[in-house]
Amino acid sequence: MTLTIKEVTQLINAVNTIEELENHECFLDERKGVQNAIARRRKALEKEQALKEKYVEMTYFENEILKENPNAIICGIDEVGRGPLAGPVVACAPILNSNHNYLGLDDSKKVPVTKRLELNEALKNEVTAFAFGIATAEEIDEFNIYKATQIAMQRAIDGLSVQPTHLLIDAMTLDNALPQVSLIKGDARSVSIAAASIMAKVFRDDYMTQLSKDYPEYGFEKNAGYGTKQHLLAIDDIGIMKEHRKSFEPIKSLL
């Protein structure tokens, strides 16, 4: 009895590798619906394979540390919010489990919102430890954004319930005695830093969404404090509020 296209599609969607797909008994079925199902499954498997390969590449720096010290406790550190006109800069410091596998981890700006939220939930529930650090708009004005970012990162490290032995940091160096590696574009090169990027992004976006409930005119829930047209028009109309960075232009020129 010949299987229906729906039945064949279900079988094809259960295939886990391209090799298995090409050797599947339905591979030579010439029905258009079957061939379309095979093409879709191949595309999905190729995408998954690419994500797996990228994930392996992004464990390079962690593995180099573990070669030297198999018991190393590696903490990734990244920040979000250096560029906005309002709100804090937020850092996150996660320590991944040894069996971590979060396909799709990347620089948070490159990850779609739905996937970002999915990864964030998985990370919060499964990592060995994580903590956030915040430097306020007032501290950014007092110290400058670079120093405030360092402060936020150190606060995240200090908040950890597990003491790390090594730090992987996105494009920064910290006044910290622990061995540290600073990686340019680290959130696209290290799974630990990418995890920090995702978690910090979701945390800060949530913070700005909450802030928008008290200050709806600025559109913080959509612009996260960046200088969008709506945000700039609101500054012109109603002025600035406590979460605005007074050392940033164009706000600085308005004072």
UniProtKB/Swiss-Prot annotation:
Residues 72-255 form the RNase H type-2 domain. Keywords: Cytoplasm, Endonuclease, Hydrolase, Manganese, Metal-binding, Nuclease. The keyword Cytoplasm applies. Manganese or magnesium. Binds 1 divalent metal ion per monomer in the absence of substrate. May bind a second metal ion after substrate binding. It catalyses: Endonucleolytic cleavage to 5'-phosphomonoester. PROSITE patterns: RNASE_H_2 (PS51975). It is found in: Cytoplasm. A divalent metal cation binds at D78, E79, D170. Its EC number is 3.1.26.4. InterPro entries: RNase_HII (IPR022898), RNase_HII/HIII (IPR001352), RNase_HII/HIII_dom (IPR024567), RNaseH-like_sf (IPR012337), RNaseH_sf (IPR036397). Gene3D superfamilies: Ribonuclease H-like superfamily/Ribonuclease H (3.30.420.10). The keyword Cytoplasm applies. One of its GO terms (molecular function) is manganese ion binding. Endonuclease that specifically degrades the RNA of RNA-DNA hybrids. HAMAP family: RNase_HII_B. This is Ribonuclease HII. It comes from Staphylococcus aureus (strain bovine RF122 / ET3-1).
